[in-house]
Amino acid sequence: MPLTKYKAACVTSEPCWFDLEAGVQKTINFINEAGAAGCKLIAFPEVWIPGYPYWMWKINYQQSLPMLKSYRENSLPMDSEEFRRIRRAARDNQIYVSLGFSEIDHATLYLAQALIGPTGEVINHRRKIKPTHVEKLVYGDGAGDTFKSVTQTELGRLGQLNCWENMNPFLKALNVSEGEQIHIAAWPVYPGKETLKYPDPATNVADPASDLVTPAYAIETGTWTLAPFQRLSVEGLKKTTPEGVEPETDPSTYNGHARIYKPDGTLVCKPDKDFDGLLFVDIDLNECHLAKALADFSGHYMRPDLIRLLVDTRRKELITEADTNGGIATYTTRERLGLNIPLDAQAPKQKATAADVPSSSVM
């Protein structure tokens, strides 16, 4: 039986730009803080490690190359000791971790999410199915075996999506069909509406993401919805601006956009613009019942005889090999990355390399 009542944490903080080691340690520090606070779940923003490359929206390809090189060098491989350290932190704190990160696999980057369980097991590994607009200059597409989201856990049926995936009606339909109860709507760093210039659509700033898309997801699916967001400082603006370009001086428009919503879309909490740390929420899964009793789009309020969604979870390979029986040999991304192997079987347990540094928190 899943727990029906527990505490969860939602991260709203500035990433460690272009610094994999510092980003891993800051992640572990937040996991430790959430664990010490009695949380059963902590949710991180989209590509929290090593930060969202928002510079790609503001400069041209040639200007971006030095930062792109550094970004790739500081992205996180899943079969690395850095990732195993994060898994150990989840195990040490007996906590579920929804981690957004720039995953490097061979020579391609992916907007990845991993759901790590309290034993350190990687329960779900997914990649954003389609990078948004200029994100295609940095990241590749997810595959059939890396896009499903909802997983049965002792905390209930938990799902996670990245950024504009949270307004994709087909992904929402897939998640709701699997009985999702808790949702991580992970967002990157985004400017606010005061920066909007016609004819750029309002969709392209943070306010609709926080105050329209995310509560709509909660209402349409009847889920507790946590929306972790990244932040920016003056120093962060300098680090994410290429040489020869004058950096912005006021980071406030990028901050204060994290949210937590109940299954009926009611706002639970949001941070002040100057807050950097963890938002806490007491989740009660029983509150999903009445929301879903009104509108359950996977059950009484849907007509699958009229409307159905085709889902293909097969991985399509560029090269396939024949197996010994004359068929086609297949494998999953999960198997290739060794995520099906228990944590202690992959590498000997090592101590963390930096001391725990507490972070700010808010209820």
Curated annotation (Swiss-Prot):
Induction section of the entry: By cyanide. Expressed on the host leaf surface in late stages of fungal infection.
Family annotation (InterPro entries): C-N_Hydrolase, C-N_Hydrolase_sf, CN_hydrolase, Nitrilase/CN_hydratase_CS, Nitrilases_CHs
UniProt KW Transit peptide keyword: no
The keyword Mitochondrion appears for this protein: no
Disulfide links within the chain: none
Top-level taxon of the source organism: Eukaryota
Active site: E46, K128, C163
Sorted UniProt keywords: Hydrolase, Lyase
GO BP annotations, alphabetical order: cyanide catabolic process
E.C. number(s) listed in UniProt: 4.2.1.66
Membrane-traversing stretches: none
A Pfam cross-reference name: CN_hydrolase
PANTHER family membership: CYANIDE HYDRATASE, NITRILASE
Sequence similarity: Belongs to the carbon-nitrogen hydrolase superfamily. Nitrilase family.
Oligomeric form and interacting partners: Oligomer of dimers, forming left-handed helical fibers.
Function: Catalyzes the hydration of cyanide to formamide. Degradation of cyanide may be important for plant pathogenic fungi in infection of cyanogenic plants.
Protein name, per record: Cyanide hydratase
UniProt source species: Alternaria brassicicola
Gene name, Swiss-Prot/TrEMBL: CyhAB
